[in-house]
A protein has these predicted regions:
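Extended terminal accessory/targeting regions
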Residues: 1-123
Length: 123
């Protein structure tokens, strides 16, 4: 079990639990459980598609594309980090900025991890 991000992103991290997607499905748990961001929702779909124990290559491709779309450019991330340090912004705005930065960092990890895993999958 490695939680990478949110409720759904990470090997054997499914629905906020230390379970494989197959175990999660066999226990009849809710696949509509909350995703905290678009990246987390992409991970949930990926888990759902791999619930049989075999991960379709198309599911990997979809998650890689979703993850890459959530990665901030260097400039955008620096701007968000600077904005989050502004003492005059609201707590909610600071929390939202930090959450988006965290999602971007996790998205890089997810895209890289799935790309590597896909190279070793037999299905």
């Amino acid at each position: 079990m490695v939680k990478i991000y949110g409720n759904w992103c990470g090997p054997n991290w499914t629905g906020g639990r230390r379970l494989s997607a197959q175990e999660y499905d066999e226990r009849g748990l809710d696949w509509n459980s909350k995703a905290i961001s678009p990246l987390d929702a992409g991970c949930r779909l990926h888990d759902f598609e791999g619930r049989s124990g075999k991960m379709p290559r198309a599911a990997d491709t979809r998650l890689i594309n979703t993850a890459r779309s959530r990665v901030l450019s260097f400039r955008a991330q620096v701007r968000m980090e600077a904005a989050a340090l502004n003492p005059f912004i609201s707590r909610k705005r600071r929390r939202d900025l930090n959450a988006r930065i965290d999602e971007s960092i996790a998205a890089e990890r997810v895209a890289t991890g799935i790309s590597i895993a896909r190279a070793f999958r037999t299905s």
